[in-house]
Amino acid sequence: MNTFLIDYRDIQTPKKGFSGLFNDYSHEGQMHDKLTEKFFHFDYLKEADYYKHLNTLVSRSFRRKELAELLIRQNRRFGTAAKHLESIEKALSPRCMFVITGQQPGLFTGPLYSIYKALTAVIVAERQKAMFPEYDFIPLFWIEGEDHDFEESATTSIIDAGQIQQVSLDPWKRLPGQMVSRSAMGPGITDTLSDFTSMLQESDYREQIVSMLQEIYTPDSSLELAFGKTMAHLFKDYPLIFLSASDPDFKNLAKEIYYRELATCPHTSHTIIEQSSLLENMGYQTQVKPRAVNLFYVNHHDQRMKIEQSSADSFSIVPDRHRYSRHQILEMCDDHPERFSPNVILRPVVQDHVLPTFAYIAGPGEISYMAQYRKTYEHFGLKMPFIIPRGSFTLIEPAVRRTMDKVLQKTGRLTQSRKQLYHTAFHDLRILQKKAISGAENHDFDTLLDRTEKNILAELEALSPTLGKLDPNLEQVLAGSLVQIEKVMTGIRQKTHRAGRRKHDELVAQLDKAAAGIFPEDLPQERVINIFYYLNKYGWGILDAFATMLRAHSSESHIILEL
């Protein structure tokens, strides 16, 4: 497998590329230093900060026994390998910390980036253990099952016959705003799974994949449970564990954050607005808009409902509009923390209150909005963990690689490397397409044919005086031959042009197909395609290949991996 690295700052082809804030944060330099100083508590590029954060976590108290019991119970349900269950007991020690990543549940695991996040957490935990052998670091995947965007969770994409095909699960007996973790998939999952697996081509791995998915994706299961079981199976050889934050026992561990948010709101929103203003003054765009109350209320149908603060001491739950005093809503929180759910602002605060989080592995979008949270953490008496960019890949299949080789031939740049070609493709795919098509049209054939015809006619005409002396009739024969030669050359030109157009059309089609594989729907591949397309074609070992690449390379570059 060949590997090439592309600087994130050079990737401009997808319509949703990487933000300026992410580019500055993920590259060592002056802008990175400014960002970490103003918007984060620790710099993942500075070794000294690792010692500071270790001391911070060791000095804090956590409800480790309750946390470990919860994790063991949940991971047994997800089917996590027994050897990884044993590692959870290390969490009882104050010298054990977590490297966390997370995502909402995805259908058949969803886009590739969930896999890359999980592997990055594993690799970062390995590195920290090597740096600090007296400590333990457990990689943990936070399953955001409280998310209520069912459509996003219940949709995935796969490549079938060179085309991107979307597969979706229709909601079954589901109410608006209902948490994904509480929604049974229903009988429709049988047809959805059949549609998905029918697009997996015959291979040595297909039968095993289909059998596994059929066992996990059943009508009575939820997307969250199926996602956790699938991920646990894929990562059975890696020490990754899982956490569902919708668990009532977890809510009890998080109650202090919910209570403080309700007791002090709208202070959290003020901290976000203050940080956002600083970011905007530096020229960055902000993503998260705070609410007066950054919690949802979960009703008895498991629907997340907005909590609105109508006055300093008055709250209402939308849409029923029943009013509560601050004292009443605080009592509700104290008695039933399972009825509250954090929004995107409070979620990481809850995470880092309950768990001793050494690092969080974040995607580009997450890093952009985490930059808005420093003062929010301080409001809750916490420090942010290290925020480390996840690994990022584009997978190049053999057919795409062959197309790239043809492009090198057509552009006449055989000395140019494929890395340079990929660089052009990721910077501006249209430029690469224009160069390749221009080379395929190959106007030099006309020049060559004109020169050849001119030379043949000139040589034959030079024979005319000699042949005329020998026999005058031969001059007429020669004249007729010259006319025939012109007709023959015209025919050759026409056939050459037709062949050139065919080559042109073939290359255009191949380039379009290659572009669809690299940038499906004009988006980064990792945000669209499902991992099982690649597992089915290339085998389970592809996960090990990803891990090897992540161990070898920093997170400052996007990895192009030729399969």
From Swiss-Prot:
UniProt entry keywords in alphabetical sequence: Ligase
The keyword Ligase is assigned to this record: yes
Superkingdom of the source species: Bacteria
GO terms, molecular function: ligase activity
Matching InterPro entries: Bacillithiol_biosynth_BshC, CC_BshC, Rossmann-like_BshC
EC numbers, comma separated: 6.-.-.-
HAMAP family in alphabetical order: BshC
Family: Belongs to the BshC family.
Protein name as catalogued: Putative cysteine ligase BshC
Organism: Chlorobium phaeobacteroides (strain BS1)
Lineage of producing organism: Bacteria, Pseudomonadati, Chlorobiota, Chlorobiia, Chlorobiales
